[in-house]
Curated annotation (Swiss-Prot):
Catalyzes the hydrolysis of lactose to its constituent monosaccharides glucose and galactose. Possesses a low level of transgalactosylation activity for the production of galacto-oligosaccharides (GOS) from lactose. The gene is lacA. Has potential for partial lactose removal in food products and improving the quality of dairy products by increasing their solubility and sweetness. One of its GO terms (biological process) is galactose metabolic process. This is Beta-galactosidase GalA.
Amino acid sequence: MLHGGDYNPDQWLDRPDILADDIKLMKLAHTNTFSVGIFSWSALEPEEGVYTFEWLDDIFESIHRNGGRIILATPSGARPAWLSQKYPEVLRVNAERVKQLHGGRHNHCFTSYVYREKTKEINRMLAERYGSQHALLMWHVSNEYGGECHCDQCQHAFRDWLKKKYNHDIKSLNDAWWTPFWSHTFNDWSQIESPSPIGENAVHGLNLDWRRFVTDQTISFFQNEIVPLKEITPNIPITTNFMADTHDLIPFQGLDYSKFAKHLDVISWDAYPAWHNDWESTADLAMKVGFINDLYRSLKQQPFLLMESTPSAVNWHDFNKAKRPGMHLLSSVQMIAHGSDSILYFQWRKSRGSSEKFHGAVVGHDNCSENRVFKEVAKVGQTLEALSEVTGTIRPADVAILYDWENHWALQDAQGFGMKTKRYPQTLHEHYRAFWERDIPVDVITKEQDFSSYRLLIVPMLYLASEETIARLKAFAANGGTLVMTYISGIVNESDLTYLGGWPKDLQEMFGMEPVETDTLYPGDKNAVRYQNRSYELKDYATVLKLSTADPEGFYEDDFYADTTAVTSHPYKQGKTYYIGARLSSQFHRDFYGTLIKELAIQPALDVKHQPGVSVQVRQDEENDYIFIMNFTEKRQPVVLASAVKDMLTGETLAGEVTLEKYEARIAVKAKE
């Protein structure tokens, strides 16, 4: 298990005493791995063609001598001032067409030939110098890729991308974008500009294609970066760090990570949940953390790396609350439980100045190993040292939930339904919750992935569904799978054009019904659905359904569609489909999926009884189940185990009732029968 984090010795080159202290403190913190060089370009190449690698040589030597490993970063995330000054074409232009000044970070043009050559040049020198170092564990390519540039270079590249996509046929583009609307038809490629608040932003096909282009252009930049790395160090794995927001742990929307993941050896991501916030319970947030971990793990169906986290507080929330005692270990254990093989931090040592000087770190401005934060980090390190056999293990799942970046983009862009109540990822959370609370493993997959290994596939709010995706869903159900779909699904194709003639025929055949009208509700509107003799509150959306061969399962209680069907089921060839026509409560999802779980004989991770707020997750290999029992509540909780397991930290046998203290986690192993 990797334990360590983002180390910035280039900020302390005039303080050899600090650098010496770092090595000593790394041992005390039970750390073993450090990502180095992420923002070090100006320290590596202070003037064009003048290289100063000696300080990095020393860091490699000292960390290796200390028994540590290095994840070496390429420095493209922040360039030196001389580069911006001499080559202003590397500067990004924003959507308002304003050229940015040098400063900040992550603000370069991904299309710039000069910047691509300069990054490849420095990357080659790093690979040649450090590629054979025993301490080199992995390449960390750039940092948190994101953003977009609207300069002339990017406009030309976008037009070339469009020409390729539409086979140099501008009529095909006009058809796909529905440009006769508002007289927006193009008759020459040169007329097309990227979306802008001071220009075109109402053509949804343009907006969608621009986002696709930004993803492809960023991947192209990444591929340019790794050319020398693959050439010189073909056996060193490559990653870059993905992101999510901090409020609801929504996947980063600037790039389609499902595309990016195909080009990485290992998925890594930066997690900063707002623990102890005042808008939700700790368990609610833990559920969302579980969801995003399961998404990023599922991208490659293998363990991922937690590349960044904070051992205490961040510095960029509205309220930067410190983790309470015990929460750092608990939140770290949760990451491991859902598939991480690392706990890495930003940052190892707090900066003395600038914008991140108050961001949490292992080592504070006091340079002390006796404070609470450092001791809790050391405890995490000791825990990870006992979990080495968990590294590389997997989390098989019978249940999958489908998340799609392009669908998210298109749905958010749609000027319809409830502008503030679409809440696509939050809706997926509510379906995921019904399984997380039952300790049933879930894969969160994308539309390109193989569906065949799952028994239950849940597809909420798939507004954008291409004919290809519909055909794959149809094949899943036909071959024996159970498929659940919801309101606002199957509305538009891959160009964000609505399907004509009603719901797509393949969906009508699969579900035995057709949605004919979607009612969008005000927050104060009241209605409910009767399902299995219980009433469940609905909000935001209610879809009127026209049944053909489907079986009605739930009924609306009020409004002009009272007593009509809200929930359906339908046998389809060897499988079965369900349609949920309204946004219903968490209790509905618990009961609805509870029925399916019984019918499909889907088993939880472990036979265990506990109260809400306790989560049990399992990783496994051919011989053992590795069991993580976590208390995300603010009070002591009893957990009743149906069979004995061995505590991996203490060696004791756990059986029957086990008590977990507030924020406590127990990690156990059980041999497979």
